[in-house]
Amino acid sequence: MTDLTAQDAAWSTRDHLDDPVIGELRNRFGPDAFTVQATRTGIPVVWVKREQLLEVGDFLKKLPKPYVMLFDLHGMDERLRTHRDGLPAADFSVFYHLISIERNRDIMLKVALSENDLRVPTFTKLFPNANWYERETWEMFGIDIEGHPHLTRIMMPQTWEGHPLRKDYPARATEFDPFELTKAKQDLEMEALTFKPEDWGMKRGTDNEDFMFLNLGPNHPSAHGAFRIILQLDGEEIVDCVPDIGYHHRGAEKMGERQSWHSYIPYTDRIEYLGGCVNEMPYVLAVEKLAGITVPDRVNVIRVMLSELFRINSHLLYISTFIQDVGAMTPVFFAFTDRQKIYDLVEAITGFRMHPAWFRIGGVAHDLPRGWDRLLREFLEWMPKRLDSYEKAALRNTILKGRSQGVAAYGAKEALEWGTTGAGLRATGIDFDVRKWRPYSGYENFDFEVPVGGGVSDCYTRVMLKVEELRQSLRILQQCLDNMPEGPFKADHPLTTPPPKERTLQHIETLITHFLQVSWGPVMPAQESFQMVEATKGINSYYLTSDGSTMSYRTRVRTPSFAHLQQIPSAIRGSLVSDLIVYLGSIDFVMSDVDR
């Protein structure tokens, strides 16, 4: 325990005290207006009174270097949390995570709520993208959002009963009664899926004509998954639309409360099922912040290498399916040939293809195999020429450019308002890539550029930025090949999981530690941590709350695709149905990333 205590002290943070925004808030609202919470999130966490929430949010949004993006918003059931020293009394809480691009800093506002008075004012008056986040917060916790434009379920069926992320809500199927779909239940479910325009503030027609309401999905090839959009059409023109998500929801955050810190790693792969190890990175880094683990240089470079391989793999599928959505079939078959080479390389290193679950708390599952460098070198010799052929043969085609240039275009202001990240944000001219601005896993040691657009994000610009991102990922991989450090593939730390196997043969204490951490799970200090990464589709993050147990008290997964789909109506109104198909192809999303 002595080693753990020393490590714990080394990881104490002063971000909550040193950030200038704390002084700005105290100057405006008084020194005693807030409770500042010490965490390992790396950002200031400030508890505000419910009555001051909108005023504080408006103040932050209007600062000289403003907090212009609502990055995340969600809740927590605090009733069973035992380690709450120094925090306001709360049965539930709601948090608001804001980002300032100019400062390259974040702030998290928290509101404490009593079980007898579960309500907060809507944040949509300040940030329109709060809409979906508030709907999910109400759905999962039963917290009323006063003034919300349409407070209804978003992940679960409209007929669902209860609030799944409450601590008293069952987490296992065996805790429910057996499911029976009677004729009456089936009729009720079908009725719940019937779209009523009036519920969404839409008119069925004007004095001269009626609008047509069309279901696109949830089983449409251009919807890219189980995704439904209800279109209000005047001929071919889209007057308005309502995205309908949740068909792929699997309760990933609830699962985090029933799995050990170690056994949850495979679930992260399936949040965005094309991203593989990219999904594991923010979770493992957040857990390592809780544990106070610093990994060896070799681990950092291996993690970067696997992440960039999966980034290339995902981008190739995105680019080829976008071209297919526009009408060209051939490139998608070429792309699958190239992706197979990546899968061969990933399988040789990890033993798996799509979902390796290979990162570990404190390292990776095992060291690189013999011959990994030869396979990577062959891929790096192959891929650049293929990228040139994609660009020359398909992406510079005049028909494709005509279908995508100027379509679903938006500027920096709209991107920030809707929480857009990744290529969609950078296409507007905002240079914000987490690997550069907030480097993690040693990205600061790599030489690469961040492709940025000219001020307007349209379908064509978003795709072309991804092509250039592919080239930069190849550049990073070359540096991994040339500069792979020697050293261990796991950190020498008591909470590294699983511990090195060879130590079990030395002493009974190490054998007991190994047995407990593998079977029961490591016990993490009671703290909060946060990690964001530049994932394949935008910024992905994990916000973890530990109550000093073998399992997470609260696992919040923020995915980019959720924010990007909420933006669809704003970007596509006034366009044609054919433009919507191109727009959907240019977003780069998968529904598991949306629905979790």
Curated annotation (Swiss-Prot):
Pfam families: Complex1_30kDa, Complex1_49kDa. It comes from the Bacteria. The keyword Secreted does not apply. It catalyses: a quinone + NADH + 5 H(+)(in) = a quinol + NAD(+) + 4 H(+)(out). SUPFAM superfamilies: HydB/Nqo4-like, Nqo5-like. It is a peripheral membrane protein. Its main location: membrane. Its EC number is 7.1.1.-. Residues 210-596 are annotated as: NADH dehydrogenase I subunit D. Disulfide bonds: none annotated. The keyword Lipoprotein does not apply. Keywords: Cell inner membrane, Cell membrane, Membrane, Multifunctional enzyme, NAD, Quinone, Translocase, Transport, Ubiquinone. In the N-terminal section; belongs to the complex I 30 kDa subunit family. In the C-terminal section; belongs to the complex I 49 kDa subunit family. NDH-1 is composed of 13 different subunits. Subunits NuoB, CD, E, F, and G constitute the peripheral sector of the complex. NDH-1 shuttles electrons from NADH, via FMN and iron-sulfur (Fe-S) centers, to quinones in the respiratory chain. The immediate electron acceptor for the enzyme in this species is believed to be ubiquinone. Couples the redox reaction to proton translocation (for every two electrons transferred, four hydrogen ions are translocated across the cytoplasmic membrane), and thus conserves the redox energy in a proton gradient. This is NADH-quinone oxidoreductase subunit C/D. It comes from Salmonella typhimurium (strain LT2 / SGSC1412 / ATCC 700720). The gene is nuoC.
